[in-house]
């Protein structure tokens, strides 16, 4: 087995371990905040958005059906995590955003794990960080593409 082949196998195995650890972490964080893991992911994704988004956009971000995304937004509203307002450009559509102060609450919840992840990242050079960022962006797109393929029955 070539060194490259062994390295690729190692990366695949470490990626699987990373994903499993992230799923466990996400569940623990959701439990700590009293949320369903999907709801936590939606809150985290909304926190990354530049402004309010449609329920349809949330469906695309989360991989949920439009109906499931609407029920997710209902739960977030009921929990006081998000607000739904009429779209000023299309009154038939609503836009969803985090409630004021929610970004700070997310930041507080992420303070300890964020510090731990930050310590890991600080051990890399700028060039290595660029490579890691590129890999994560590209791997994320592969994941999204494969989820779409599987959802479409492919």
Regions found by a protein language model. Name each.
Residues 26-65:
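N-terminal helix-turn-helix DNA-binding core of bacterial DNA-binding proteins
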Residues 18-25, 62, 105, 109-120, ...:
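Alpha-helical linker/hinge and terminal dimerization helices associated
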Residues 1-3, 128-154:
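C-terminal regulatory/oligomerization modules of transcriptional regulators
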Residues 3-6, 30, 105, 127, ...:
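A structural signal for alpha-helical segments
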Residues 9-16, 115, 126, 130-137, ...:
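Amphipathic alpha-helical segments that line or abut small-molecule/effector binding pockets
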Residues 74-130:
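Charged, amphipathic alpha-helical coiled-coil/dimerization segments
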Residues 1-33:
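N-terminal leader segment of winged-helix/HTH proteins
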């Amino acid at each position: 087995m070539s060194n490259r082949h062994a390295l690729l196998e190692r990366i695949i195995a470490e990626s699987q371990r990373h994903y499993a650890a992230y799923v466990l972490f996400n569940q623990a964080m959701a439990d700590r905040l009293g949320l369903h893991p999907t709801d936590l992911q939606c809150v985290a994704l909304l926190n990354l958005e530049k402004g309010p988004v449609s329920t349809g956009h949330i469906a695309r971000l989360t991989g949920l059906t439009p109906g499931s995304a609407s029920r997710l937004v209902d739960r977030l509203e009921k929990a006081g995590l998000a607000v739904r307002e009429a779209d000023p450009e299309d009154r038939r559509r609503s836009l969803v955003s985090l409630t004021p102060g929610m970004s700070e609450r997310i930041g507080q919840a992420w303070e300890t794990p964020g510090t731990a992840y930050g310590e890991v990242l600080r051990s890399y050079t700028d060039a290595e960080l660029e490579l890691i960022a590129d890999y994560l962006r590209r791997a994320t797109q592969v994941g999204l593409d494969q989820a779409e393929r599987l959802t479409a029955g492919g």
